[in-house]
Amino acid sequence: MLLKKIRPHLFYALATLTAALPAAASAQTLKSGDVAVLASYYEIRGSDCLALRAPRLSLTMMPRLGKASVMQTRGQSSDSGRCAYQTVPVSQLVYQADQAGSDTLAWEVKYQNKTLGTRRYSATVVVTPGP
């Protein structure tokens, strides 16, 4: 009986904790010469759906086999939730694959929202020889 009462709360606590943990390293495969957006970030104040300035994105570990750059653009928020499809300023991490091999890069994202704070991410890009 006690387990039935606790289970929904335990599930909610675990889901919240999982959402708060930093993202694990991700992997993507590209061909030499390809250009890809590895990550895009925006920030919306949820209470009134106000689009805030794009989060500050900075590279903390540069790739060895390709080039990475930070681009500022405008885009749309996700397609779900109360603030869906809002036009927002976006920071993007763009990677250009040069040499074949496994390349790793890392970056951090600084949000205006103190709860989100600064988040750190990394990615491994596998580059295969181009055509």
What role is predicted for each listed range?
Residues C49-T87:
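Surface-exposed or secretory-pathway low-complexity segments enriched in glycine-proline
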Residues A25-M62, K114-P131:
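Extracellular interdomain linkers/hinges and stalk-like, low-complexity segments
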Residues M1-R7:
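N-terminal secretory signal peptides that target proteins for export/translocation
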Residues F11-A20:
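Bacterial N-terminal signal peptides
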Residues Q92-S102:
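Extracellular/luminal low-complexity segments enriched in Ser/Thr/Pro
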Residues A84-P89, Q99, G117:
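A generic structural micro-feature
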Residues E108-Q112:
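Beta-strand-rich extracellular modules
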